[in-house]
Amino acid sequence: MEGIAPRLSDFGIKEGTLVWDRGNTSQKTVTTLEKYGWELVCGVAKRSKEAIDIVSTTEVTSNLENHVSCGKKGHIYAVQKTAKLFGKERNVVVYLNLDKYTRCLAERNYKLNEISATLKNLQDNENGLSTESIRKMLGNVLKNHKKFFEIQWVEKQKPCFTWKINHEERILAENTAGKYLLYATNENLSAED
């Protein structure tokens, strides 16, 4: 995206507002476009520590004041705040898609309970299995949910591993589920805008 500002200038287009989804947003992109004087409205992916911190620590309540009208199909709530993003304090909007939040939470809880039952069963029935085969089985069971579990290996003891839910990761996932971050250079825009 940062290459677009010089190209637009080459065509004589010197000002305006660029709008894009969160996939192309980086500190370099934002600062370059701001340097060229462009207004921005963009999503910010939950990849950087700054973005994750903003989203996870911002409470977006589902009350009338935070409701964003988007027709009959969606339940969106948003709050505006000032937070450090891309190296400086900026006005940002955190919005909550209540339907997505509820679906993510239900699906994750179901999966974590399913994995927990499988781990318990594996512990109870590990006799005759080598540690290596148990490690392989655990890898297959945990897959994309590994960060939600803490596994400890115990030498010369049965069961040969212990496990527990990683509540810190679970809470972080819960606090970011269905929530998204938006940034606009125009500070006159409201959360609803």
PLM features: what roles do these ranges have?
Residues 1-193:
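Anion-binding and metal-coordination hotspots
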